[in-house]
C-alpha cells in the first residue's frame, strides 16, 4: 500500500507539525515500507500456532481501590502563577485555537 505525500501532510497538519517537502517524501516512503511489511506478515501461514494474547509472563498486580485524602487544593495552587476558578492558565501553544 502506498502512502502518499498528501496523506503525510494531512496527518502532519492534524498534529500541528510542519515538514519540508523532502521530509514529507521521506516519511511517505518509509511509512509505505512499514505498511508493506505489516501486510506481508498477514500472509504468513500460522496454521497450528497457538494464539498469543500477551508477551508478559507476569500476572497483573492491582492495588486495592481505597479512598485516600488528597492534597488540599489551595496548597496545590499556592505556586501557580496564573489561575482562574481553580483552573491553571497556561500560554496558548496553537496558533489557530487548536481545532483539528
Swiss-Prot record:
One protein family per Pfam: GatC
Gene Ontology biological process terms from the UniProt entry: glutaminyl-tRNAGln biosynthesis via transamidation; regulation of translational fidelity; translation
Signal peptide: none
Functional description taken from the UniProt entry: Allows the formation of correctly charged Asn-tRNA(Asn) or Gln-tRNA(Gln) through the transamidation of misacylated Asp-tRNA(Asn) or Glu-tRNA(Gln) in organisms which lack either or both of asparaginyl-tRNA or glutaminyl-tRNA synthetases. The reaction takes place in the presence of glutamine and ATP through an activated phospho-Asp-tRNA(Asn) or phospho-Glu-tRNA(Gln).
Name listed for the protein in its UniProt record: Aspartyl/glutamyl-tRNA(Asn/Gln) amidotransferase subunit C
Keyword Zinc in record: no
Disulfide bond sites: none
EC number: 6.3.5.-
UniProt keyword list: ATP-binding, Ligase, Nucleotide-binding, Protein biosynthesis
Amino acid at each position: 500500500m502506498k502512502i502518499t505525500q498528501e496523506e503525510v501532510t494531512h496527518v502532519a497538519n492534524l498534529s500541528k507539525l510542519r515538514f519540508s517537502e523532502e521530509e514529507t517524501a521521506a516519511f511517505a516512503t518509509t511509512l509505505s515500507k512499514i505498511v508493506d511489511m505489516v501486510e506481508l506478515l498477514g500472509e504468513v501461514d500460522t496454521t497450528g500456532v497457538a494464539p498469543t494474547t500477551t508477551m508478559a509472563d507476569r500476572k497483573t498486580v492491582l492495588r486495592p481501590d481505597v479512598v485516600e485524602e488528597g492534597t488540599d487544593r489551595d496548597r496545590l495552587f499556592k505556586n501557580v502563577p496564573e489561575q482562574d476558578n481553580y483552573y491553571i492558565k497556561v500560554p496558548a501553544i496553537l496558533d489557530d485555537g487548536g481545532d483539528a
